[in-house]
Amino acid sequence: MAKKITGYIKLQVPAGKANPSPPIGPALGQHGVNIMEFCKAFNAKTQADEGTITPVVITVYADRSFTFITKTPPAPVLIKKALGLQSGSAVPNKTKVGKLTKDQVREIATKKMPDLNAASLEAAMKTIEGTARSMGVEIV
């Protein structure tokens, strides 16, 4: 028989840098999850991408055990990483902060494809292009 699920926790944590301080500690603590056990498992699984913001969905069961699924980093994080930016533009329609080539967009879309609800790579590329435009990044 399957375990009874008591809740889901969605967090965005820097890869390889999970620690019991907020926001992780309080979020897991209120569900009765062993915080250090999660931190060790998460850090071991994500040590290759150290420092990159990684969304994680934690499923908590009635016996206080848990499983977690890591997702691909958010599109803005990948775009900023590709361009070497700290942040997007405060006024995206007026101030442009960088230029992204179609090849870079294709690379980001390919990486994000498992987590996007796009039917094709072209649709995923359009999604990434829209995100880039809203950050003040030009597509060339």
UniProtKB/Swiss-Prot annotation:
Q: Summarize the protein's role.
A: Forms part of the ribosomal stalk which helps the ribosome interact with GTP-bound translation factors.
The superkingdom of the source organism is: Bacteria
What is stated as this protein's family in its record?
Belongs to the universal ribosomal protein uL11 family.
Name by which UniProt lists this protein: Large ribosomal subunit protein uL11
Q: How does it assemble?
A: Part of the ribosomal stalk of the 50S ribosomal subunit. Interacts with L10 and the large rRNA to form the base of the stalk. L10 forms an elongated spine to which L12 dimers bind in a sequential fashion forming a multimeric L10(L12)X complex.
Q: Name one GO biological process term.
A: translation
Q: Does the keyword Ribonucleoprotein apply?
A: yes
GO molecular function annotations of the record: large ribosomal subunit rRNA binding; structural constituent of ribosome
Q: Which Gene3D superfamilies match?
A: Ribosomal protein L11, C-terminal domain, Ribosomal protein L11/L12, N-terminal domain
**PTM note:** One or more lysine residues are methylated.
Q: Could you tell me which species this protein originates from? A: Citrifermentans bemidjiense (strain ATCC BAA-1014 / DSM 16622 / JCM 12645 / Bem) (Geobacter bemidjiensis)
Pfam families (alphabetical): Ribosomal_L11, Ribosomal_L11_N
InterPro entries, per database record: Ribosomal_uL11, Ribosomal_uL11_bac-typ, Ribosomal_uL11_C, Ribosomal_uL11_C_sf, Ribosomal_uL11_N, Ribosomal_uL11_N_sf
Q: Any idea which UniProt keywords this protein has?
A: Methylation, Ribonucleoprotein, Ribosomal protein, RNA-binding, rRNA-binding
Lineage, highest ranks first: Bacteria, Pseudomonadati, Thermodesulfobacteriota, Desulfuromonadia, Geobacterales
Give the record's GO CC terms.
cytosolic large ribosomal subunit
- SMART domains with a match to the protein in the record: RL11
